[in-house]
């Protein structure tokens, strides 16, 4: 994803008419290059470790699988000197000191393999998440209005240019999972359904017409890509 962000950033700079937006993209590019060279995060907010597991039904694991994942997160954040943001209780606010627990989602699949994807999710973007229970009569137009309005309300808070994950359908908890899962899809891979692939492009254009721009300084580069699941 990082390489695709680099490529899309270069394309965005070429197409960006606003000088301040171009300059901001250059600064973001310099930061990304420095992070790659020094093996450091591009932002101090290294967020929560969201772990997606595809676990084969023929896999047998001795011991606690979740405990092993938490230990991996603990070591990664400690050895990598990443900021510890996670609290043991959301209201009493005591920091766990090692960024655990992780948010773990397990999806059972056929076979005897196990695939683990770790996606650190910064809270600057996480806090901009929204959910809406649309009425059937709202239709696709209501869906599009909600998506564009969500980005408009968020403004500069998620540090644009953003990558947007959108979940649609299912229950309250399922749609949030779909939105997270959508962020794992490579930026250059459209939805396999032509209807949703076209909708992704339509929404991308509408969002970039909002004029929020890089870091909220204006311009047409508000969103590098989005995925609907």
Regions found by a protein language model. Name each.
Residues 7-9, 20-25, 39, 79-93, ...:
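Flexible, glycine/charged-enriched surface loops at secondary-structure junctions
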Residues 7-55:
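N-terminal low-complexity or amphipathic/hydrophobic leaders
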Residues 108-110, 115-117, 219-229:
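C-terminal edge-of-domain segments
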């Amino acid at each position: 994803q990082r390489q695709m962000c680099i490529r899309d950033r270069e394309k965005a700079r070429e197409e960006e008419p606003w000088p301040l937006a171009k300059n901001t993209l250059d600064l973001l590019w310099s930061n990304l290059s420095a992070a790659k060279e020094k093996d450091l995060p591009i932002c101090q907010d290294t967020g929560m470790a969201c772990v997606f597991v595809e676990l084969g039904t023929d896999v047998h694991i001795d011991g606690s699988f979740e405990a092993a994942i938490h230990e991996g997160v603990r070591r990664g954040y400690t050895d990598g000197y990443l900021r510890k943001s996670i609290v043991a209780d959301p209201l009493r606010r005591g920091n766990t000191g090692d960024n655990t627990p992780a948010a773990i989602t397990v999806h059972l699949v056929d076979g005897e393999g196990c695939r683990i994807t770790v996606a650190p999710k910064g809270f600057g973007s996480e806090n901009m998440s929204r959910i809406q229970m649309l009425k059937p009569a709202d239709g696709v137009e209501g869906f599009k209005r909600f998506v564009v309005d969500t980005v408009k309300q968020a403004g500069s808070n998620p540090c644009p240019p953003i990558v947007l994950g959108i979940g649609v359908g299912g229950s309250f908890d399922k749609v949030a999972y779909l939105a997270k899962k959508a962020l794992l899809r490579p930026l250059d891979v459209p939805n396999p359904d032509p209807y949703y692939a076209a909708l992704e492009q339509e929404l991308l254009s509408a969002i970039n017409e909002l004029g929020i721009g890089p870091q909220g300084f204006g311009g047409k580069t508000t969103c590098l890509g989005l995925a609907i699941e």
